[in-house]
């Protein structure tokens, strides 16, 4: 069986940049302030807030998104929106769990959406 790792659809990162920039505008914060408050490097925050179909390998980590959420003091609903935007595969995982999908069925949905698979073989 061939190993297949799909490229993650980069569109979500454009949406993530818009979302975080919106939170910054609401608070009248600069990306530099977000970097300070979140403990992330200015370069990391810049990659996230200035993303325009750039390097597809630049995906923020779960820890980075959590640090941003804490720094911005987001509500529960805002945190969910942030994480769902940063990690669109989470929505598929949630649906799969709720609907009782198998790993193969879940991988089929992830594959169709250009998201990372649960397994390395396809």
Please describe what each predicted stretch is.
Residues 30-38, 68:
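Short alpha-helical "recognition helix" segments of helix-turn-helix
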Residues 86-101:
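Charged, helix-prone or intrinsically disordered regulatory segments positioned adjacent to compact structured domains
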Residues 39-60, 84-85:
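Recognition helix of helix-turn-helix/homeodomain-like DNA-binding domains
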Residues 32, 43-46, 77:
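Key DNA-contact positions within bacterial/archaeal DNA-binding proteins
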Residues 73-90:
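Short C-terminal boundary/hinge segments that cap the last helix of small helical domains
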Residues 1-33, 104-122:
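A short, Lys/Arg-rich alpha-helix, primarily the initiator
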Residues 60-78:
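DNA major-groove recognition helix of helix-turn-helix/homeodomain DNA-binding modules
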């Amino acid at each position: 069986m061939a190993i297949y790792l799909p490229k993650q659809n980069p569109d979500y990162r454009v949406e993530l940049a818009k979302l975080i920039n919106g939170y910054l505008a609401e608070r009248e914060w600069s990306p530099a302030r977000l970097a300070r408050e979140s403990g992330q490097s200015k370069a990391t925050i810049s990659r996230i807030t200035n993303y325009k179909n750039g390097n597809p390998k630049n995906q923020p980590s779960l820890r980075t998104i959590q640090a941003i959420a804490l720094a911005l003091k987001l509500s529960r609903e805002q945190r969910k929106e942030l994480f769902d935007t940063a990690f669109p595969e989470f929505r598929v995982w949630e649906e799969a769990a709720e609907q009782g999908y198998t790993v193969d069925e879940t991988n089929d949905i992830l594959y169709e959406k250009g998201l990372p698979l649960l397994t390395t073989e396809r």
